[in-house]
Curated annotation (Swiss-Prot):
This is Membrane-associated guanylate kinase, WW and PDZ domain-containing protein 3. Residues 220-231, 267-277, 947-957 have a biased composition (Polar residues). The keyword Ribonucleoprotein does not apply. GO terms for molecular function: ATP binding. It comes from Xenopus tropicalis (Western clawed frog). ATP binds at residues 117-124. Residues 232-241 have a biased composition (Acidic residues). CDD domains: PDZ0_MAGI-1_3-like, PDZ1_MAGI-1_3-like, PDZ2_MAGI-1_3-like, PDZ3_MAGI-1_3-like, PDZ4_MAGI-1_3-like, PDZ5_MAGI-1_3-like, WW. It is found in: Cell membrane; Cell junction, Tight junction. InterPro entries: GK/Ca_channel_bsu (IPR008145), Guanylate_kin-like_dom (IPR008144), Guanylate_kinase_CS (IPR020590), P-loop_NTPase (IPR027417), PDZ (IPR001478), PDZ_sf (IPR036034), WW_dom (IPR001202), WW_dom_sf (IPR036020). Its main location: membrane.
Amino acid sequence: MSKTLKKKKHWLSKVQECGLSGVGGDPCSLLEIRGGAEHGEFPYLGRQREDVASFIVGKVPSQGDVLLEVNGTPVSGLTHRDTLAVIRHFREPIRLKTVKPGKVINKDLRHYLSLQFQKGSIDHKLQQVIRDNLYLRTIPCTTRSPRDGEVPGVDYNFISVEQFKALEDSGVLLESGTYDGNFYGTPKPPAEPNPFQADPVDQVLFDGEFDTETQRKRTTSVSKMQRTDSSLPEEEDEEEREAVNGSSGSTDHRDRQEPSEWGKTVPSYNQTNSSMDFRNYLTRDENLEPLPKNWEMAYTEAGMIYFIDHNTKTTTWLDPRLCKKAKAPEDCEDGELPYGWEKIEDPQYGTYYVDHINQKTQFDNPVLEAKRKKQLNPAPSEGTVHQEPENSQFTRDPSQLKGALLHTSLKKSAMGFGFTIIGGDRPDEFLQVKNVLKDGPAAQDGKIAPGDVIVDINGTCVLGHTHAEVVQMFQLIPINQYVNMTLCRGYPLPEDSDDPVADIVNTVPPIINGQMLTQGDINMGSQELKSGVIDLDQRGKPGLMVVNGRLNGPSLDIQDQRTSMASSGNSLPELVTIPLLKGPKGFGFAIADSPMGQKVKMILDSQWCPGLQKGDVIKEICHQNVQNLTHIQVVEVLKQFPVGAEVPLLILRGGPPSPSKVTKVKSDKQELMGSIEAIAPGEPLPQPLPFPPNLARSCSPKLDPSEVYKKSKNIFEDKPPNTKDLDVFLRKQESGFGFRVLGGDGPDQAIYIGAIIPLGAAEKDGRLRAADELICIDGVPVKGKSHKQVLDLMTNAARNGHVLLTVRRQIYYTDKQQEEEELQHTPPAHNGSPRLNRIEVSAIPKLPAEAYDVILQRKDNEGFGFVILTSKNKPPPGVIPHKIGRVIEGSPADRCRKLKVGDRISAVNGQSIVELSHDNIVQLIKDAGNTVTLTVIAEEEHRGPPSGSNSARQSPAPQHRPMGQTQPTYGTLDRYSWSDHKADCGPALPAGSWQALSVGCYPVELERGPRGFGFSLRGGKEYNMGLFILRLAEDGPAIKDGRIHVGDQIVEINNEPTQGITHTRAIELIQAGGSKVLLLLRPGTGLIPDYSLAPSSLCSYVKPDQQ
């Protein structure tokens, strides 16, 4: 009787997954873990406790099953000790992925490594993972000689052939073979690590977040070497498998009927109470590729699957891999929802739909809506002039593309790759090159042209990727590194490619008010964000206005807004931040006067100002508002930057918008009713849509409310009113995190964010602001900690390559804002569904008052020319107690034309002064030297929370009394009493009477090294400037200390103030200190004032012969 042919199954089909929860103690007490690389074995399961089934969710694994992964982390190749460490690292529930041992994969690690597999296969990848884990604890050996740059004992252990044979015969080598005539082998790792060896657990868990220097490189020689036993055994078929514990083959037969049971989610609970279509989520296709780098799949306590993006520290319900397989809405079946959509059944609002990707809500079913639009706008007939080209049909298969494929390699410059892209709004839309920027890398390469479809980036097919995903891929490539791209030529640009909304898409997106703009964003400046203009959400799209965490106004349809904005033509203004680089002859452009300010007259050398265009109006230079400066003043501001400085320039491009071209929110109800044509007369206005997912129904899994309360109670229970707390996650760049830390000089002094370094990580992120109070660093509260302790926490974060900051930001009231918010108070949500009172559009308040910086520069024989008034009584929460009481005619404050009586001052030189006393503020301004930066909120924008009647509107501003007279008390100003003081109205104080600054500065004591203290100075009285750190010597005491940075101002040297002293005197003070020097430093911005003097005359290293 002939035996029926059976289909051989890969061991992958036998992999099973289970969840371990409710243990309470050590999970290893429930399931014994045996094996380990030190024994030449995979980790595998040993004895099990009798009650193990009560703690397992899913199928209970058997004794002897090979352990492959723990919570998605591969443990093959780890030692027994490290495997236990990985298991104990995770909180419950713990997911275990195991496989029954067979002929290919079993306990024998040496056997598996000896097999040859096809490159790119599952087994080949698993072998590489095993080697990566082995190299954390062991070092491969070879009989060849060391090559240039290789370090014995680090890259390889270089041994003789005799030694190698001895190791092989003793069974110490897990794998061995020959490559290029030399022997290579991988020894077993020791059971216990070297006491000086780093703990590899974090590298195993978050491999991509560590520097490549700390990871052992994969050895090509070991991967490609010829092994003595490399024949691949056939895996046994399903029907031949032996019965376990007396069970028959029926179970196996059942497993065979259900494909890929190992890949199903465990447990199979409903993912949500809503009707979100998770059919594609519950079964994982074997052909589905692995999760993107630094992504992880996890379970909630209820067993629901969610995904963690370790790149951004965010979570989502959406499987990022399924985005590529998403169908267009019109192609979905009845009852099916497009990728990223969710159906909500709400008892008050009825049924509505949430688009988690675009973060919008609507009442219409998106599938039915798309099919209805498709029927109303059928495909053009053959006789239509604008016939759709045959080759424009979208595909995710590169082999199906119509056109010529081309390959190119571009080197990333400081301005990116030199081309802009468009598309990727929908899953079925190509991403195409829109423009090739002149003189950029793409233009110099000469291969890329507008319309080219981006097919592949560094080996990753991006057909079907979203615009944001591709932009992020380009952003992750470091400057001066290359990108390899495959493009397809033969597809026309879309018809709306000249749409101004679509035109602001760049490979390196423009930065608008600190936020990067991406495809589909509507670009508007702060001038448009006033009363009556549609508010834009955090992505620049029209939506619900949020003030102090509350929702006001309806959600407008994004597509309608896109159409209305696009109809405004090319005159739509846009604010764009362009990074400039100062060359030997300047920035490469000329400016001229215009009614709107200084505008670009011509481009002289575009390599220093790429992206700048003729006619651009300059708004800010390095975050300094220059709109009201004269032509000469703007030229002087640009001249102060040294050659090689990178300067962000904020420009206004395009003409001012016509009032008829900007969609307004009518304050008059009758106007509003008349402007909505779709509503019949007498029909009530529809209720505003519920919260979008980013406000009420988060697109991320929520923690248990009690858990959130417990975690936050200790830190935030004394949170002051009118403040908001936010978390900011930053990744470290080469220059650090991009901000300075102030405060912490005393136990009661708070820690604040100081200067935001231009083009640094914090500025690129855009969420952190100067004067934010620092609450936590990576979950560690900093209240009561010293400045040094905070720096130590930041140093530890720098070692990890990222930091999570919790900051507290003061919220300042605008006119009538509090009353409006009280009228529109929103009840709390019930059962996860939002509740929203019916409100009229006219009730939308203005945005919180916009603060702006004013930089004042004075001469030695004059003061800054303004008087600060401070409230004697403690004002209500949200009111800034310091305001301008007088501006002296002809003074720097008067000449700048930006300060007026009544303006509130919230910060000085980036340091919040809201909680400071008047004397401290005056001293802070005195110690600023000849330049001070004030953060101002205009008087008409800041009125504080209203209370009954506001007498400030009925009473004139108090006149400042002449010097020498009694300081009066004004009881009519905002109903508070104020005292007026002169702040720097007269000449600068002599050096002897100048007091050391205690707020915002920090002391640093250095011991002289063999070559001095390791820093150089610039400035002094003879150069009409203060003293600044110019350079830091490599391996010098200053750079080793870690607190001194280029651009920091020296306030004191050995307890002697530097106000008004010469450069020579500063050197003498340092010499007088002997082997030590004590410096009091004020954090700078990283830039050093340059008054066009020769650098050699402004700086000198402090060397031993000078001391």
